[in-house]
Amino acid sequence: MDFITELDIAFQKIASKESATPMENYMKNKFSFLGIKTEPRRTVFKKLYEKHKSEIKANFRNMIWELLNKTEREFHYVALDLSIKEFKKNYLQEDINLIEKLITTNSWWDTVDAFAKYLVGGYLHQFPKETYVVIEHFSNSKNMWLNRTAILFQLSYKEKTNFDLLKAECEKHKHSNEFFIQKAIGWALRDYSRFNPDGVSNYVTSTNLKPLSKREAIRNLHKNL
């Protein structure tokens, strides 16, 4: 029995309709849920990962894509966990095409933000010369989730964040009326403010950001503004 088939069977055994309803409501009824919470889901994944490690190592890209296209959200979370685990420092240059598909398939903040931080951030850390090409493509896309990714992908970069690039993305999207874009701008700036508070403070005070973006950006800087 292959990994995904066994995962499906294991999930059906622990599914809970009672838990599924509030989980679906929390996600604005965007997706169907089996009602499996994080800890038991990851316990099943860990057990089956060890059992099917050879199969997964040989075919994880196809598995991730198959999982993300299943109906229930729990499978999408497994796709996310599997992608982070297997891609780590192991990217091929052409993987950016799959990563873009992952971001734009069954998209919502709970998967996109992790794909942005871990997959896009990790990929561009491994292939830094691709940064401007990839981010320009994402930033100019009509897909809002790719735009959000272009803003958030440096969340794990800490003091190595390219602040000029972050500011350029904020400038490009600062007039957006989309909640998820305004929130991303504030989040990215707030995160970087831990390492460059003066730079973020100066940028926020000199830039006409949307109120939500500004509130999020200065949450840890309000004493200085």
Residue ranges and their predicted role:
Residues M1-L225:
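Alpha-helical scaffold domains
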